[in-house]
């Protein structure tokens, strides 16, 4: 996808994580050929009670035993610069993530709805 290749030119590392089991991840990868090249990290094995990271980040949804759909943009100093968290039934927007990353990387004040590469304030 264009968003995936754009990330590679952004001096950024894109990782994905999941509390899904291996069977779910294989099915997801088969359904999304364009996203197979993204590095994927298994953050927690909910079957074994390994929840510390997703609990610390505040994205564990106990009724489902899974992490909510979250995106974190973290700078090189490990400071979270941007967070979005959605319920399990709402997907995320790769284009919006790239737009926010682009704005953060300008180091300047950016207007709402600024497009990637657009002018700063």
Where are each of the predicted segments found?
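Chalcogenol-based redox active-site neighborhoods
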Residues: 1-121
